[in-house]
Every structure is written in structure tokens, then in C-alpha cells.
Design a protein with these regions (language model features):
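Generic structural signal for well-ordered alpha-helices
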Residues: 80-84, 120-128, 153-154, 180, ...
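Catalytic pocket-lining loop regions of alpha/beta-barrel enzymes
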Residues: 160-164, 172-287, 332-334
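Active-site gating/metal-coordination segments in enzymes
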Residues: 93, 99-202, 206-207
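A structural motif corresponding to the C-terminal end of an alpha-helix
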Residues: 86-93, 126-135, 222-226, 280-281
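Histidine-centered divalent metal-coordination motifs
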Residues: 23-29, 197, 232
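Active-site neighborhood of phospho(di)ester-bond hydrolases with catalytic His/Asp-centered motifs
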Residues: 19-22, 97-98, 138-139, 166, ...
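Conserved, mostly hydrophobic/aromatic
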Residues: 23, 87, 123, 165, ...
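Mid-to-C-terminal alpha-helical segments outside catalytic/metal-binding sites
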Residues: 1-20, 31-86, 93, 155, ...
């Protein structure tokens, strides 16, 4: 084997194993981007989130990635095929996509709140149906339009044959809001799991007070038969509570989105000690996720980094795919 080959090639030569990316974001594709509320804002202007996408712009061939985008036609040529290309480059079998439906609180300059909407039907058509065996998804749900509307959002996800829903507290409010409880009850009835964001957020109008993982304690207590996936494990927010949630509740799992190789050098993020804690106390309840395309420039490097950490091979395989396959009861079609 050539010494020039990377970690992924060496893994493939020794044992056939495919990564499952449990957390990625569709909707930022150039085609029809203004039809999906909030999605153009990821590229437009000089906001924190737009600046965070400049690396992706460079990798996607933008000749001026640090310029300010003002019009949709200036967006990079980003497509569903781009997802598949990056997945293939990083030995990723499949990816779980996050459909989003949320509205922030009012804030100065926007009395109606900022809206973010990636429709279930769009993701099903452009990703799941177009690339069989490569994608699954969760449907966006929020309580801003009332209890019954939230229940109908759950039903929409079920009708799209999604395995679960996503609550995005920065654009939806507290996840233990009683107005969401009928939606959780409907998920139990239909056999859907619930994913809840607990990381920090830099999008317009979002408020940090809603995203602390402490509020998932209520949901897990009140719905012990509901499978809950805690997204981001409270990173930059309350990671210790995130860890405790998974230890305390049999029905609560977590991902480690985003395992950025540089940020993982610091204790304020997820350093090696954090990952080894997960390996020791909850090796079967943690999933690998990337927030792609936010992580596009380091998409392959993230896999290399995890696979090179001083962790057992058994745990690496659980973390990088086997745990999430079991969680979804996923039947691989590409192996």
C-alpha cells in the first residue's frame, strides 16, 4: 500500500466499513433557493453565518469567496449532487438530512421574526428519491402556529416516510413548551423519533436561552417511550448537561455535530477527553454528524481525525455509523 494513501483508504483496505452522517442540512442549493425561506441568508451579506460559509464557497469554485453575495445568482453552484460527491470522497454511505420549519421571536428590524423553511417534499424529491439508499430525513416542526399545526407537521413527516422530526429551539422556542406535547404524542403514536437542537446558533433572530439541553430533561421525563436525539450535545452551551441527559435517560441519545478537527483541540469544544467520556459511559448512544455543508472544507478531514484518535476500533465503528443505523433500523443498500 502506498504511503501516500490516507486514513480512509487504509480503513477500506483492512475492513469494509461505511460512515453514516447523522446530521446534515439541505436547502442551500442554488436552484430555487429564494423559494426556501431563510436559505439564501446562509450565503447573503456579511453576517456571521455568511462568513462561515466562505470556506465552502472557495471549495465550490467561487473565484471571490470573501466577497459579499447580494443576489441569488451569485451563490456557488451547490447541488444535491455535491452532497453525494463529498459523501463518496469521505467513505460515507448515507446521510440524515434536517428539514427545517421555524420562526424566531420578533427582533429589531423584523417584527414578524426570521423564518427558516426547508420543505419535507423538497428534500424527499431532490435527495431521497433521486439517490436511493443515500439519504433519509427528519421533518421540521414548530409550535408557533398552534398545537394542531405542529401535529400536522408531524403527520407530513410521516407521510414522507421520514423516521423522525426535528425541533430547532432557536427558531421554535423552548422544547418543553406544552404546545409541543401533542406533537410528541403524535410521534409516539406514529413511531417517529424526535431530534432537538441543543447547540449554539448564529442565525438571524435566534436566542440562546431556548437551546440549553436542560429543557430536554423535561421532554425525556414526560415521554419515556419517545426516542429523543439531542443534537450537538450542548456544545458551546451546556455540554455537561448534554452528557448527563444521555446518562440519565434511557430514551435519549446524542450526536457530536460538528467534530471539527481544529476545534477539537480545545476543552471548550469537544476535546479527546470528551470523546473518551462518551466511549466509556455511553458507547452505544452517540452518533457522528457533520452539519454539512457548513463543514464542507473539512468534510473528509473530520472522518480522518476521528479514525486517528486513540479510541477502540469497536467504538469508532459504533460512533461513525453502526449506532445510528441501529437507531434508525437502517438497511444498507450500498454495501
Amino acid at each position: 500500500m502506498s504511503e501516500q494513501q490516507g486514513t480512509i483508504e487504509k480503513i477500506l483496505a483492512q475492513k469494509p466499513f461505511k460512515v453514516f452522517d447523522s446530521h446534515a442540512h439541505p436547502g442551500l442549493e442554488k436552484k430555487g433557493i429564494t423559494e426556501r425561506a431563510g436559505c439564501f441568508d446562509f450565503w447573503r451579506g456579511n453576517t456571521v453565518v455568511a462568513r462561515s460559509m466562505m470556506g465552502a464557497r472557495a471549495f465550490l469554485g467561487d473565484p471571490n469567496p470573501f466577497s459579499t453575495i447580494t443576489k441569488p445568482e451569485e451563490c456557488p453552484n451547490f447541488t444535491p449532487e455535491t452532497f453525494v460527491q463529498y459523501m463518496d470522497s469521505a467513505n460515507v454511505e448515507a446521510m440524515c438530512l434536517q428539514c427545517i420549519h421555524g420562526v424566531t421571536d420578533p427582533y429589531p428590524g423584523n417584527k414578524d421574526g426570521w423564518k427558516w423553511y426547508v420543505p419535507n417534499e423538497y428534500v424527499k424529491k431532490e435527495f431521497i428519491d433521486a439517490f436511493p439508499g443515500r439519504f433519509t430525513a427528519v421533518g421540521g416542526v414548530h409550535p408557533r402556529y398552534g398545537k394542531q399545526a405542529a401535529v400536522e407537521m408531524v403527520i407530513s413527516a410521516y407521510e414522507c416516510r421520514f423516521p423522525g422530526i426535528k425541533i430547532h429551539p432557536p427558531t421554535s422556542g423552548y422544547p418543553n413548551n406544552p404546545d409541543l406535547y401533542p406533537a410528541y404524542e403524535k410521534c409516539q403514536e406514529l413511531g417517529l423519533h424526535v431530534q432537538i437542537h441543543t447547540g449554539v446558533e448564529e442565525l438571524p433572530g435566534t436566542r440562546a436561552k431556548y437551546q440549553d439541553p436542560v429543557y430536554l430533561d423535561d421532554v425525556a421525563m414526560d415521554f419515556p417511550n419517545l426516542k429523543i436525539l439531542q443534537l450537538h450535545c450542548g456544545v458551546f452551551n451546556n455540554p455537561m448537561m448534554g452528557l448527563w441527559n444521555v446518562i440519565k435517560h434511557d430514551n435519549l441519545y446524542t450526536d457530536i455535530t460538528i467534530p471539527h478537527p481544529t476545534l477539537m483541540q480545545f476543552k471548550y469544544y469537544w476535546d479527546l477527553d470528551h470523546i473518551r467520556f462518551l466511549e466509556f459511559f455511553m458507547p452505544d448512544k452517540v452518533f457522528y454528524g457533520t452539519d454539512f455543508p457548513l463543514s464542507l472544507p473539512v468534510y473528509r478531514a473530520m472522518v480522518d481525525n476521528i479514525m486517528n484518535l486513540p479510541l477502540t476500533t469497536e467504538f469508532k465503528h459504533k460512533l461513525m455509523g453502526d449506532n445510528f443505523r441501529k437507531f434508525l433500523n437502517w438497511k444498507s443498500k450500498t454495501q
